[in-house]
A protein has these predicted regions:
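PAPS-dependent sulfotransferase catalytic core
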Residues: 1-91, 101-113, 117-133
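A short acidic, amphipathic alpha-helical/loop segment
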Residues: 95-98
Length: 133
């Protein structure tokens, strides 16, 4: 689902020069998509239109530079908290050093979303089954 208000804000605003105040990482099937949805409804929080930028885990995206990452935050207000949700940051060891490098002066808060492993595995099985995989 596309948030049209967010799309309008991003299309006419200059790129952001701010890094996120917080990152949310976590296990698959641990409600990161739901959290992203609810946080986008809060007027004091700004999240990228796409939930997972994959910037710190994807070699091609990372090679495009920090400016490419900051483009995802175009339209953030001065008073808004800036965040990103990407579960994969928890699994890719290189992401930690990349985040540490770029956030050296102002480390973000990092929120981990976890779920009971048995319930998570069953939920993943059901999703895979529904998709016919």
């Amino acid at each position: 689902m596309v948030d049209l208000a967010m799309t309008d804000r991003q299309s006419s605003a200059p790129p952001s020069s701010r890094l996120p105040d917080f990152l949310v990482v976590g296990a698959q099937k641990s409600a990161t998509t739901s959290l992203h949805h609810y946080l986008t409804l809060h007027p004091e929080i700004f999240l990228p239109q796409i939930k997972e930028t994959k910037f710190f885990v994807d070699e091609q995206r990372y090679a495009q530079g920090i400016g490419h990452y900051l483009d995802h935050f175009t339209g953030v207000g001065d008073q808004q908290r800036l965040g990103e949700i990407d579960p994969d940051y928890m699994y890719f060891s290189e992401a930690v050093s990349r985040i540490r490098h770029h956030f050296a002066d102002a480390p973000p808060k990092i929120v981990f979303l976890l779920r009971d492993p048995v319930k998570r595995a069953f939920s993943h099985y059901l999703m895979t089954y529904r998709r016919g995989l």
